[in-house]
Amino acid sequence: MRLSRYFLPVLKENPSEAQIVSHRYMLRAGMIKQQAAGIYSWLPLGFKVLKRIEQIVHEEQIRAGHIPLLMPTLQPADLWRESGRYDDYGEEMLRITDRHKRDMLYGPTNEEMITDIFRSHVSSYKDLPLTLYHIQWKFRDEIRPRFGVMRGREFLMKDGYNFDLDYESAIHAYNRHMVSYLRTYERMGLQAIPMRAASGPIGGDNTHEFLVLASTGESEVFYDAAITDLKFGDRVVNYDDRAECEAIVKEWTAPYARTDETHDEAVFGQIPEERRRSSRGIEVGQIFYFGTKYSEPMGATVVTADGSRVPVHMGSHGIGVSRLLGAIIEASHDDKGIIWPEGVTPFHAGIVNLKQGDSSTDLACEALYRDLSARGLEPLYDDRDERAGAKFATMDLIGLPWRITVGPRGISAGKVELTNRRTGESEEMSSGAAVDRLAQIYAGI
């Protein structure tokens, strides 16, 4: 993409309404525009990152054997009355009446609807286990929406639901989701720690939240520092192997890690003092096992091998897709702007032409643009007639992991400059070597 043809409405000054870094940089980098309290339009740069994150989520869900579908944003209130949650949910739920005077709601979650889909089409234990998921916009009428996409009223979320014949199978689904989430977050350049948490209005007696450590987090967290040394890495997982999934879950849940709602000071005190940590965290996902909480009242049952009919065991599993943008920025930025991890960057590298209009630099930039594209990479070429300082400031603000700088002096020596946004380190090399280096880096992402 050529920046001269791109829609990137960057702001020079910090917006007064932005209280935290991620909100400030998302507005300044032209990623979002507020349309109402807690409701945003996603502008091209922000939308591009959103789709990168969504793609990683899809890939890891499918890798784990989960099946995508799409449910509507509007739901009939009668489904929620069946489960007993329609009146319990409170004012966060946006209730709507259509022209036929039917009660509807803008879904904050989908347990009732997915249960209705299941009971309409599945009746035998032979069709289990089954896990369905979707990525869809949700709405919760927060009383005080703030912090940009971190606590908005409308948000994009992946929510998945497992249906299993018995407790043991449902716990395997729980473990499978935890393993899948660990891989998902690490691919995004995040360390998201699974922490024992409270279930809230969704219910159930087994739940973990995934939290990214950040000073702006809404939750107080307590943990053993040993957990921050764990890496998922490139291990290959057989998601059908119960023992393998259980072992990974034990590895990640053995060190103490809890939110303030479930914190146990006595247990925490048994950890060596030098490893005890308290901090704040941003919730980016949560997994639940809630047994027959929804299947029993809503009649989601299957016939077993002996002919008896039993309610299925269920769980739900969510990832805050739009919230992840804010969490990534909170965890990865400096005083110049965003620093995107390679896995979610909107463009793989920026090309800066130091002397637009000079035939040698123009030709070199065009060749770089063409060669990077031919290797399957997406460059952002700053071909504007702007001073070099303004171009560097824009690149630093939007946070592309790599920048290639092209100028007349370097071209005369057959060199370009490749700069790492995170470290600030620069290296001169040929254009071909720069293309090869970037292709190698992204081949491993």
UniProtKB/Swiss-Prot annotation:
InterPro entries in the record? aa-tRNA-synt_IIb, aa-tRNA-synth_II, aa-tRNA-synth_II/BPL/LPL, Anticodon-bd, Anticodon-bd_dom_sf, Pro-tRNA-ligase_IIa, Pro-tRNA_synthetase, Prolyl-tRNA_ligase_IIa_type2
Q: Write one Gene Ontology MF term.
A: ATP binding
Function per UniProt: Catalyzes the attachment of proline to tRNA(Pro) in a two-step reaction: proline is first activated by ATP to form Pro-AMP and then transferred to the acceptor end of tRNA(Pro).
* Subunit structure, interactors included: Homodimer.
Q: Which family does it belong to?
A: Belongs to the class-II aminoacyl-tRNA synthetase family. ProS type 2 subfamily.
Q: Name one GO cellular component term.
A: cytosol
Query: Which Enzyme Commission number(s) are on file for it?
Result: 6.1.1.15
Q: Does the keyword Cytoplasm apply?
A: yes
Domain of life, source organism: Bacteria
Read off the Pfam families from this record.
Answer: HGTP_anticodon, tRNA-synt_2b
The cellular location(s) given in this protein's UniProt record come to: Cytoplasm
* Reactions catalysed according to its record: tRNA(Pro) + L-proline + ATP = L-prolyl-tRNA(Pro) + AMP + diphosphate
The encoding gene: proS
Q: Indicate the principal place this protein occupies in or around the cell.
A: cytoplasm
Name of the protein described by the UniProt record: Proline--tRNA ligase
Spell out the disulfide connections: none
Taxonomic lineage is: Bacteria, Pseudomonadati, Pseudomonadota, Alphaproteobacteria, Rhodobacterales
Q: Which HAMAP family match?
A: Pro_tRNA_synth_type2 (MF_01570)
Question: What keywords are assigned to this protein?
Answer: Aminoacyl-tRNA synthetase, ATP-binding, Cytoplasm, Ligase, Nucleotide-binding, Protein biosynthesis
Listed under GO biological process in this entry are: prolyl-tRNA aminoacylation
- Gene3D superfamilies to which the protein is assigned, alphabetical: Anticodon-binding domain, Bira Bifunctional Protein, Domain 2
